[in-house]
């Protein structure tokens, strides 16, 4: 007796229905896709009990003819493709011919439609079987009424959530369709009550209308780019808005919501220099790509897509977002929302400082040869605090270069070709009141009824980073090439893939053997940092989020900047603060916030004076 047998046709249809229809929101998605594909300019949606009891869709689209209505619920019937060639350039939301047949198998469905103004027809289907077909008064478009969802799928029905959760899932589907089709009027009704009407509008107005509350009704910034067969439109939140999850990163490809890890990473990467680790951007990406270069025939619900050239697309998105923030960092005025302090916020308690406070706070440029490996954040844990203090003050009096020499060392021609900070008569003075340095880590500044607590390492790091990026660069060939090796195959593959990019940065690397390379030429701005470069190459365990150039400059800036526990002179501190305000610095090259500020009013409120 044969163990392998043909399945019953009805059973096959039930299995297929279970793949594409798993809950009411799946039915809603398929019906909305059909309405949109029909060219509708108005869609009315009625949901009862989260779609569990009833889903009713009314549209003014092109309608379904009498002949097509008789077969539209059968498996693999569709008006959207007719050949394999059509599958290679899909321009509609639906194309498989599975939606209506799957819905008809797991529920009762009634479809009333017309293609003329004279008459319409209605078909009623239960459990995939036609029960009624009749003539009806003329309507403009199509009405689809779905009831008794999963009545013949008891296991599936048991796993449905409570009404509020199913409603929320349906609203999420509606949101995806509303946001991607601003040219359509949508009317949403829940449990026979009007919930919301969205009128025809531009995409930017629709995004602002739907998602504006996420950024407290501030305005999104819009980035538009076109490249060959790709159009990109990205809606970016102001810099001061971020989230602790990726929930507000949404990607749409040819008006479809797509869950694509690579696109999410590209967006996150583009924001990397303005967001600290653990924070994610608020961003909505809309891609329009020639259908011949993408494949939607991957996932039953079309939530995934294959791209013809994903690495190029990844770089295009990431680099454009990065460049957008670079260009706007100095001229875009953020709308700052006044942050109300919570009871958990702590103000740094300031004590009266002695008159010679600023005179004691001098900064000694590190002169050791271990600059590349110096710990940025923590002193040696085995060293007591008293030893740290003693060593710090000893460094001030033992053969210390003058402050003027120190500043000259940082910004002289032989270091990164930085101009020396202009003197007081030449430089752009910004009015502020420097209060002092605390914890050997933060600079405190008063400016226009606000107090700033500025991270000294982060602000100096950002200043150096910006100077590096904007400085004139010349190639410098090493008299003796520096050989180095890498520890594993993964790093070797990454360096091999990046060699051409290094050449564009005037960094010439040659491979001289398995896992062995030699550094032959470098830009003049890196002339003192060969060891930093080598360490940078040897730590490339993955392609990082920024461009190679940004990664490298961030590494050099981090090594060169003043550190925590460095004592700074008043003059040098004021120089950093002036640059901080002049450049409107907000984040370090790694995305961490550089400062915290509190207004006079907030401070007075904290001590019950307001």
Curated annotation (Swiss-Prot):
Any Gene Ontology biological process: mismatch repair
Record-level GO cellular component terms: mismatch repair complex
Family statement: Belongs to the DNA mismatch repair MutL/HexB family.
Purpose of the protein: This protein is involved in the repair of mismatches in DNA. It is required for dam-dependent methyl-directed DNA mismatch repair. May act as a 'molecular matchmaker', a protein that promotes the formation of a stable complex between two or more DNA-binding proteins in an ATP-dependent manner without itself being part of a final effector complex.
Protein name (Swiss-Prot/TrEMBL): DNA mismatch repair protein MutL
Top-level division of the source organism's lineage: Bacteria
HAMAP family: DNA_mis_repair (MF_00149)
Keyword vocabulary terms for this entry: DNA damage, DNA repair
Residues making up the signal peptide according to the UniProt record: none
Organism in which the protein naturally occurs: Borreliella burgdorferi (strain ATCC 35210 / DSM 4680 / CIP 102532 / B31)
């Amino acid at each position: 007796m044969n163990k392998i047998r043909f399945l019953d046709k009805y059973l096959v249809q039930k299995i297929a229905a279970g793949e594409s229809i798993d809950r009411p929101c799946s039915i809603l998605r398929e019906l909305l896709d059909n309405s949109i594909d029909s060219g509708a300019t108005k869609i009315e949606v009625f949901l009862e009990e989260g779609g569990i009891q009833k889903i009713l869709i009314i549209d003014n689209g092109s309608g379904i003819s009498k002949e097509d209505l008789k077969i539209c619920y059968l498996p693999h019937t569709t008006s959207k493709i007719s050949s394999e060639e059509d599958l290679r350039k899909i321009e509609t939301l639906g194309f498989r011919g599975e939606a209506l047949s799957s819905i008809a198998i797991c529920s009762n469905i009634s479809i009333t439609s017309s293609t003329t103004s004279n008459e319409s027809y209605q078909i009623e289907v239960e459990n995939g079987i036609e029960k009624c077909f009749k003539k009806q008064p003329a309507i403009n478009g199509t009405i689809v009424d779905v009831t008794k969802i999963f009545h013949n799928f008891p296991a599936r029905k048991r796993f449905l959530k409570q009404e509020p959760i199913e409603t929320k899932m349906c609203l999420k589907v509606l949101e995806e369709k509303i946001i991607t089709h601003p040219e359509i009027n949508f009317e949403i009704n829940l449990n026979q009550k009007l919930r919301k009407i969205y009128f025809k509008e531009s995409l930017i107005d629709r995004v602002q209308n739907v998602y504006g509350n996420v950024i407290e009704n501030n305005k999104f910034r819009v980035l538009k780019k076109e490249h060959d067969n790709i159009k990109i439109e990205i809606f970016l939140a102001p810099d001061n808005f971020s989230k602790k999850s990726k929930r507000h990163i949404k990607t749409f490809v040819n008006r479809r919501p797509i869950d694509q890890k690579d696109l999410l990473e590209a967006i996150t990467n583009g924001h990397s220099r303005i967001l600290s680790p653990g924070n994610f951007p608020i961003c909505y990406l809309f891609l329009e790509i020639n259908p011949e270069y993408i494949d939607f025939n991957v996932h039953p619900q079309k939530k995934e897509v294959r791209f013809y050239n994903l690495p190029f697309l990844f770089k295009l998105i990431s680099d454009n977002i990065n460049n957008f923030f670079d260009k706007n960092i100095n001229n875009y005025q953020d709308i700052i929302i006044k942050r109300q302090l919570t009871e958990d916020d702590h103000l740094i308690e300031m004590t009266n400082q002695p008159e010679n406070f600023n005179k004691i706070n001098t900064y000694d440029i590190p002169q050791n040869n271990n600059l590349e490996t110096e710990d940025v954040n923590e002193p040696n844990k085995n060293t007591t605090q008293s030893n740290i203090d003693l060593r710090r003050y000893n460094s001030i009096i033992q053969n210390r270069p003058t402050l003027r020499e120190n500043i000259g060392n940082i910004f002289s021609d032989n270091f990164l070709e930085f101009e020396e900070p202009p003197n007081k008569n030449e430089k752009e003075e910004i009015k502020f009141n420097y209060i002092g340095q605390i914890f050997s880590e933060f600079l405190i500044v008063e400016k226009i009824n606000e107090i700033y607590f500025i991270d000294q390492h982060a602000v100096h790091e950002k200043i150096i980073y910006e100077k590096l990026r904007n400085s004139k660069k010349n190639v410098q060939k090493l008299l003796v090439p520096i050989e180095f090796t890498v520890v594993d195959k993964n790093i070797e593959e990454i360096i091999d893939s990046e060699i051409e990019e290094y050449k564009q940065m005037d960094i010439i690397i040659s491979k001289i053997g398995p896992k062995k390379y030699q550094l032959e030429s470098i830009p003049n701005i890196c002339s003192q940092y060969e060891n930093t470069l080598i360490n940078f190459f040897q730590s490339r365990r993955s392609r990082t989020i920024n461009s190679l150039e940004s990664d490298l400059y961030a590494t050099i800036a981090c090594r060169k900047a003043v550190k925590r526990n460095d004592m700074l002179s008043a003059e040098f501190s004021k120089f950093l603060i002036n640059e901080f305000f002049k450049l409107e610095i907000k984040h370090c090259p790694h995305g961490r916030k550089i400062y915290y500020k509190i207004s006079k009013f907030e401070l007075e409120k904290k001590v019950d004076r307001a």
